[in-house]
Amino acid sequence: NKNALKSLTQSDFIIDLTKEGLMHSKETKEILSSGSRIMTISDEHPEILSRLKPDLHLKEIVRDAVSKSKKSKSMEVTCERGTNLKINLLNTNTVGVWGWTDKPGTLAHWPGGLVVSFPNKSSVNGKLVFKQGDINLTFKRYFESEVIFIIENDYVVDILGNGTDAVLMKSYLKGFNDKDAYATSHVGWGLNKRSRYEALTMYDKNDLNGTEMRALAGGFLFSIGANEFAGR
């Protein structure tokens, strides 16, 4: 709708209450280029929003994390569970969200408190192991059995595991009939200490969008799907 787009580009401040958010719209770049600020209020239960209201201290924490990420040549993710993932960060687009927008031409979402990088093409390789208790935001549930991603040049080339979680993941991704559904979208980590690990158990799936889990302090974030910076 050209008239709607024109109105948005002429607005100084936009409050986004849509289900998925303007951040996933192809028109967003044009809107931000006009100097408009977009404040996305994530589709979360009101109690989540009240617990994770904007925190002034988060801004410096997130900005510091973004700075460190941008200065790094690579990211290596390892743990005793078997994960060994290497990510090339050279010339990677990295952004941080602290929960509000205070600069023209920027977009933020509430809740905030995370940093994410969008790796360039052929930048992600290794093994990512999900164990019981890890969080699967695709299905808004906790893993109950082991799932292993084998990743080569950004793409999940094999999914290992004998439990329900592996079966669901294989079936879900196969349903897209699209190789890029298996490609790395972004990686990052959470920085919001107010986020609660057990929050997924407290709400119906329709009552949350999972932003709290993405911002969970200390949690590593790995996402597959679209990545415009890698041409996908």
Predicted segments, located by residue:
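Compact functional segments
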Residues: 228-232
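Active-site bordering "gate/hinge" segments
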Residues: 1-144, 148, 152, 178
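Dual-mode signal for accessory low-complexity, basic/Gly-rich regions
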Residues: 142, 158-225
